[in-house]
Amino acid sequence: MTDNVNNAESWAEHMRSEFVTMDVEQALQTMTAEPCVNHVPTMTGGFGAAAVRQFYRDHFIGQWPSDTTITPISRTTGDDQIVDEMLITFTHDRVIDCILPGVAPTGRKIEIPAVAIVRFEGGKVTREHLYWDQGSVLVQAGLIDPEGLPLAGAEAAAKLKDPTLPSNTLQAKIEAQPVPSSGCLG
């Protein structure tokens, strides 16, 4: 149990350095000598201390809008791993390289259900993999029109916050649309 507590404390300190103190070197002190950060949907991050330092300095720490909130939803812990489910909310008022690389601010509110899988060695972060639905982000940013596509926008975050909201709404939406003919029969 001690490892789980130490890992949770290390992860909390890591998150504080990323989002509260916004201190790259402090973040790296919570990590092993050869860490890996991988934001899977956008393929951003780095491998090794130098690459992670550059990513944090140039593309992550300090780039988040001032209204960013991270709301924990659930946590699963093991001897050397934590899996956190969370809701990340912000107003897209600046370029955020790790979420919407190269996309000019849209001024839109973005709510992202996300999962972080964090592995530890000796009480320090060695692997940090983040997953989220980039389609939902692109819909909320106004970059994709969801009409006719099996994509959710902010509804995905709303459903995470309130499990009593209806499920299967995309299926109903798609089923209500006429299926175009292939023209093969005539």
Regions found by a protein language model. Name each.
Residues 1-186:
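C-terminal and inter-domain tail/linker signature
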